[in-house]
Swiss-Prot record:
It is found in: Cytoplasm, Cytoskeleton. GO terms for molecular function: ATP binding; hydrolase activity. PROSITE patterns: ACTINS_1, ACTINS_2, ACTINS_ACT_LIKE. This is Actin. Transmembrane segments: none annotated. It comes from Fucus vesiculosus. The keyword ATP-binding applies. It catalyses: ATP + H2O = ADP + phosphate + H(+). GO terms for cellular component: cytoplasm; cytoskeleton. Belongs to the actin family. SMART domains: ACTIN. CDD domains: ASKHA_NBD_actin (cd10224). Its main location: cytoplasm. InterPro entries: Actin (IPR004000), Actin/actin-like_CS (IPR020902), Actin_CS (IPR004001), ATPase_NBD (IPR043129).
């Protein structure tokens, strides 16, 4: 199977960003938006070779004349043609490798539909002719990256959030909570809040500007009501942001109202419980003997956990929910934006993992359903 000298590829396909690189590296080589853009208008420039589709950063930079689509929604692939374009772009343009020469480790959202997993496997073997592949759950990889095998991972990206309890390296599927509330919803909500202030953001291109505002200026308040009072009484919380056209907008309480949605989804009309509540419920669904280990190892991962103040707020909320004697530790590793990828890089380079790969021969013998037997 995988020879020691052939480097495996690790591809973490997120709803918002695709992270790709080589096993044994400590960071992904390529990080680009999971976007496919198509021209809104037919080309009129003679001699310009206009493509029918642009992927990633190129789509991002030409966003003014393109319609942008995300093929992965809520962590699950909804458009396979576009997804194939993203993988093609990953291998040939970003990493510049021939996929038929490298084993490929892919990641998936917990509770991913079975058919999706099979389709992923099929495309890898039949379209890209990879020699071997494996699919792993994102949250488990994040935990590996933090050097643990037991813990409760809150993984929140652009399209979906999950709380996943893991004991001795195994995810406990019955206790996984899935929350269709993540970075993209926060961006949409911030767009709406800014529109109320008289700044209009409507197009897919303008959404990217709002995402940038969100990433640069927002934070999680430790005490939301107190923070609202402070914001109303003075302007010390206000920050300004320069738009690409030179206009400057000022944002005040929007800075912490935006990520507050994670703790109070009712702000955007969702009936689900907040991330602190999901984490608590996940732990309560686990065996009473392992709860102590889970409470003591709550690991944050994904781009939407990058808000300043989220760790402290999480600790505060969980302390209020859990038994008073319980010691609660929320770990927010600095590299958590890429910890899924880093975990994949660690896993794919372990000598003990080499027999786990699904080989082309096994696939040819059993077909796509082999993925359920080998990857769990």
């Amino acid at each position: 199977m995988a020879d020691e000298d052939v480097q495996a590829l690790v591809v973490d396909n997120g709803s918002g960003m695709c992270k790709a690189g080589f096993a044994r590296d400590d960071a992904p080589r390529a990080v680009f938006p999971s976007i496919v853009g198509r021209p809104k208008h037919p080309g009129i420039m003679v001699g310009m070779d206009q493509k029918d589709a642009y992927v990633g950063d190129e789509a991002q930079s030409k966003r003014g004349v393109l319609t942008l689509k995300y093929p992965i929604e809520h962590g699950i692939v909804t458009n396979w043609d576009d997804m194939e374009k993203i993988w093609h772009h990953t291998f040939y343009n970003e990493l510049r490798v021939a996929p038929e020469e490298h084993p490929v480790l892919l990641t998936e959202a917990p509770l991913n539909p079975k058919a999706n997993k099979e389709r992923m496997t099929q495309i890898m073997f039949e379209t890209f002719n990879v020699p071997a592949m494996y699919v792993n759950i994102q949250a488990v990889l994040s935990l590996y990256a933090s050097g643990r095998t037991t813990g409760c991972v809150l993984d929140s990206g652009d399209g979906v959030s999950h709380t996943v309890p893991i004991y001795e390296g195994y995810a406990l599927p019955h206790a996984i909570n899935r929350l269709d509330l993540a970075g993209r919803d926060l961006t949409d909500n911030l767009m709406k809040v800014l529109t109320e202030r008289g700044y209009s953001f409507t197009t897919t291109a303008e959404r990217e500007i709002v995402r940038d505002i969100k990433e640069k200026l927002t934070y999680v308040a430790l005490d939301f009501d107190q923070e609202m009072k402070t914001a109303a009484e003075s302007s010390q919380l206000e920050k300004s942001y320069e738009l690409p056209d030179g206009n400057v907008i000022v944002i005040g309480n929007e800075r912490f109202r935006c990520p507050e949605v994670l703790f109070q989804p009712s702000f955007i009309g969702m009936e689900s419980s907040g991330i602190h509540d999901c984490t608590f419920k996940t732990i309560m669904k686990c065996d009473v003997d392992i709860r102590k280990d889970l409470y003591g190892n709550i690991v944050l991962s994904g781009g939407t956990t990058m808000f300043p103040g989220i760790g402290e707020r999480m600790t505060k909320e969980l302390t209020a929910l859990a038994p008073s004697t319980m010691k609660i530790k929320v770990v927010a590793p600095p590299e958590r934006k890429y910890s899924v990828w880093i975990g994949g890089s660690i896993l794919a380079s372990l000598s003990t993992f080499q027999q786990m790969w699904i080989s082309k021969a096994e696939y040819d013998e059993s077909g796509p359903s082999i993925v359920h037997r080998k990857c769990f």
